[in-house]
Amino acid sequence: MSGRMISRRSVLALAACTALGAVGCSKTEEYNGPELILRYAENQPEDYPTTQAALAFADLVAERTEGRVKVVVYSGGELGAEQSVIEQMQYGGIDFARVSLSQLAEYQPALSVLQLPFLYTDAPQMWRVLDGEIGDEFLSGLGAMDLVGLSWFDAGVRSFYTREKVETLANLAGLTLRVQESDMMSEMILDLGAEPAQVVYSRVYAALHNAEIDGAENNWLSYEAMGHYEVAPYFLKDEHARVPELQLASEAAMEKLAELDERFPDIIRTCGKESALAERRLWAEREASAEKHMREWGVEVTILSTAEKARFRAAVEPMYAAFEEQSRLIQRIREA
C-alpha cells in the first residue's frame, strides 16, 4: 500500500470521540486528520507510470481540499484484479481506480471501437480525440455503470516482436503470435495472415525461448521489463494498436465528496486531468528510454514504409465491418 497512513493515535482518538460524543472529548483529543479517506486501486507496481500518476493525484487532492480528503493508493493489485475492482467500484467498495480499456469494454461495448487496430495515425491524433468531444462522450457514457470517467491515461503503442526478422506483411504469414485474451486481437492476427496464440503473460518468455510461438506484441516498456528482447530480438515497429486506459471514480465516492463540500467533485475532476498529463509525460520518457536501451542492447528495429503500413491497414479493414453502426464515429476519429 502506498501513501502515508493516518496514525494509530489519531484513529483511536476519532473512535473515542465517535463512541462518547463530542462533549466527552477534550480539545487536545479532537481528531484533526482528514474528514474523508478514499481508496484508489492500481494493479501496477509503485514505480510504474500509472501508479506514479495515482500518487500525484492523491497529493493534488490533499492539497486542493486543504487536507480534508485523503486518497490512499493501493498498488500491485492489492485490492484485487481489474475486473473485481470495477465491480467493487459499482457498489462503492472502491473509490478510484485506473483500469484498462479492454476490461471496461466487457461492460460497456461501445468502448470496443477504441481498440480497433490502426485507428489513429499517431499519438497526437489519439489525444486530440480523447481530450476532445469524442473522449468526453465516452467518459459520460460510464455513468450507466455508476462510474465517473476522470481522464485518459497512456498505455503506449503496441508492435510485434519476433524470433526471426519480419519486414513485411507477407513475412507474418503462418507465424504463431501471442496476443492478449481478446477476440478482437485474435481476429487482427488472423487478418494479418498469422495464427493467434493465447499464452499466459508470465509464460511468454518461455514460449518464445522454446519456439512454441514465433513472436508476440506489446509496448516498449513491457518488452524491456519482461526480458522478451533476449529471445525475440527483432522488433517490427508497426504500431498497430494505441489503446488508452482510464482513471475512474465511483459515483458513490463523488456523492460523498459533494456532501462534504459541493466544490470537491469539480476539484477531483481537475486533479484527475492534471495527473493524467503527468502520467503521459512520464510514460513518454520511460518509453523513449526503453527503446533507446533496447537498440543499444542490439535489438534490430524495422520501421514500416508508408506503402507497407498501408498494406497492414488494408488487411485489417474487414474488422471495421463489425462496427457499421459506429461508422460515423470512426469517421469522426479518423478526421480528428
Task: Show the residue positions of the predicted features.
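A gly/proline- and charged-residue-enriched helix-loop-helix capping module
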Residues: 126-130
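N-terminal secretory/targeting leader peptides
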Residues: 2-6, 12-124, 134, 142-336
